[in-house]
Regions:
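Charged phosphate-binding loop/patch that engages nucleotide di/tri-phosphates or the phosphate backbone
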Residues: 153-187
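Acidic interhelical loop/turn segments
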Residues: 105-123
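Short, flexible loop segments at the rims of nucleotide/cofactor-binding pockets, characterized by
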Residues: 74-75
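Amphipathic alpha-helical interface elements
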Residues: 1-68, 82-93, 97-108, 134, ...
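Short loop/turn segments that flank or connect secondary-structure elements
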Residues: 126-127
Length: 187
């Protein structure tokens, strides 16, 4: 039996760019889930859920989260959550570019990639460097942390104390010898 080598098209993205785009997509997915879960927990058992909780459009769930979760907090916690809401709105256009575009690059600017898409009958182009993608991913991680722990490290410590502790996937793999050193690095 003859073995065929699969023929595939290259994305023309570097390994770092592929990793960072994947990180952004993953972080945003978790962000949407965090917002949805917090909003869902704001409803009483048996209470009718609004159509926005069908989770078909994140912007609708986000508005409901602002109303039912963020605006119900006191003082500093409310300020932290409102700031995250503003950051999510700001980052949303970049997320759309990352997720819904075809990527392009030019030989005269090899350290830059351009996300190209059609939106509302116009062509949109957003340029990114690897460092900008890394910054975007980090900002999303920070937003997620602040949404889950608006009181900061004290909230995280309380959660850990109440749950009896936690070990990350990386920690688990490291302890049980399943991870390779390159898998544990973020660079």
């Amino acid at each position: 039996m003859k073995s065929e080598v699969p023929i595939v098209l290259n994305t023309e993205l570097s390994e770092r760019e592929i990793f960072l785009i994947g990180s952004i997509v993953s972080q945003w997915g978790f962000l949407e889930s965090d917002i949805f879960e917090q909003t869902l927990l704001s409803f009483e058992d048996g209470e009718d859920l609004p159509a926005s909780m069908n989770n078909a459009q994140f912007s609708s769930v986000l508005k409901l989260w602002m109303e039912r979760v963020a605006n119900k907090q006191d003082g500093a916690r409310q300020a932290v959550l409102k700031a995250q809401y503003d950051e999510i709105l700001y980052l949303s256009d970049f997320r759309q570019a990352v997720v819904h575009s075809r990527w392009d690059w030019r030989p005269d600017t090899p350290d830059e990639i351009t996300a190209v898409r059609v939106h509302k009958k116009s062509v949109k182009r957003v340029k990114f460097t690897g460092d900008e993608l890394a910054d975007f991913s980090t900002r999303l991680g920070q937003v997620r942390y602040r949404i889950r722990y608006p009181g900061g490290p004290e909230d995280r410590a309380t959660e850990l104390a109440e749950s009896g502790g936690y070990i990350s996937r990386r920690g688990f793999e490291f302890l049980f010898g399943r991870a390779q050193l390159p898998d544990l690095r973020d660079d």
